Amino acid sequence: MQKVHEELERILPKAIALAEDIFKNPELGYKEFRSREKVEEALKDAEIPFTEVAYTGLMATLDSGKEGPCIGLIAEFDAVPVLGHPYASSDQNAAHACGHYAQTGVMLAVFLALKEAGVMERLTGKVKLFFTPAEEFCDMDYRRNLIREGKVSHSSGKQEMISLGLFDECAVLLSCHSMGLIDTDYQAEVGASLNGFCQKKVTFLGTEAHAGANPHLGVNALHAMTLAISAINALRESFPEEDCIRVHYIVTEGGQTVNSVPSRIKMEMYIRGKTVEAIRSTERKVDRALRGAALAINCDLEIQNTPGYFPLEQDSALTELVRSQILRYMPESRIAEGTHGTASGDM
């Protein structure tokens, strides 16, 4: 173990430099071509073979050559759209506001340290490193096009890797994630759970008419959408606190011209919850609100559902093992345990 720590200290500056480079050059999911290239350069320098998988993903293996369990290390490296972020890309406002660049540096450093310390000579089994693309559930039209073109089969990178069977050999998967904790003394968190979610693409279809001369001849799809939002907001008091429900949305198309009654309005939304049943129960309420609003305004309605991520529950034995190692670096008072986050992830 001491040799691994020594190698980590030696590798750390290069790993941090790589992570900072990726931070300053963010790419959205299934577009991480440059980020992958930087990781590949680091693996080549260490003489570790790798395989490109899942469109923009990457996989590498340290093999002891002896029968034994396989441990997987997972790192994400996609960014998320953040308008106004100081390091946002000029083309798509992509920024590493979720900290995936840090995962890249951390897991690469661990993998290289295991290799350089010669750990596999004293172990059985394998250690696999996965750079998984497209964790952030965004830029969905682009991803749907990739699916239509047959380049991927699923909207997220880990879903894609699961479908390809890339995790099948692994007995255990380890990952890490930066957390934007504010006003806290905690420096680490273990055993946290997360909400799951489903994604909806909603289209209200009305009838165009001149908004000044003949508005009575039109059917205003924008009114249907605003009515639906009001209905969803009125439902919020029916969401049980213990279900940790979140329903949030954006308008992706709000009309074609001010001079016309809006005939097509599009919105996307997430429904998040602590359990699958909580998500399904809330989804039924939201769908009823959407249908009721469309019916009230006499609009047609289209709802396209995309499976998101399951709620996250971590393995208790593995969590305790990780916690015991964190205690080597900080006191117990700095470790948060068993919290629930209402965000989501695809681990």
Give residue spans per PLM region:
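Acidic/His- and Gly-rich active-site-bordering loop/insert found
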Residues: 1-97, 101-128, 133
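Conserved active-site and cofactor/substrate-binding residues in soluble primary-metabolism enzymes
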Residues: 10-13, 30, 34, 38, ...
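Residue-level signal for inorganic ion chemistry
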Residues: 22, 161, 269
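Active-site beta-loop-alpha junctions enriched in small/polar residues
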Residues: 27, 76-78, 134-136, 179, ...
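Metal-dependent amide/peptide-bond hydrolase catalytic core
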Residues: 45, 226-347
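Glycine-rich beta-alpha junction loops
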Residues: 77, 178-180, 206, 253, ...
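Histidine/acidic-residue-rich, glycine-tolerant segments that coordinate divalent metal ions
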Residues: 85-95, 101, 117-248, 255-260, ...
